[in-house]
Amino acid sequence: GKDIHLPERKTEKSAGYDIECGEDIDLIPHQVTLIKTGLKAYMKDDEYLAIFIRSSMAIKKGLFLANSTGIIDADYYNNEDNEGHLMVAVYNTKDEPFHVNKGDRVAQGIFTKYLTMDDDHAEGVRTGGVGSTGVK
């Protein structure tokens, strides 16, 4: 996207990559809003991207992720519903709208490896975007 910045860590010991809002948007009070980031993330099969709200957004602004922690699986990348574009589902706890400017850092992502059980035989195939894992 135009003028989209890749996430970056701000210090050498930061675990999370700061994720910016990809557009100007108003977060409606007491509702969930999907914030577009303009980003996609490719990962190896044994990795996922964990998305968290930035602590300053939660503590100072009353914003929370609607699902507590976003889990972006490796097979979300280039899915047929939305091509794997990352969105952040934010809940505004306040009684007034909250404006987020394009470029504001709203979340952070941490790339994580995971293990599977010895007898794991998952054969499902992602058939779309958010919440759409199934078998083709």
Where are these regions (language model features)?
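DUTPase catalytic domain/fold
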Residues: 1-136
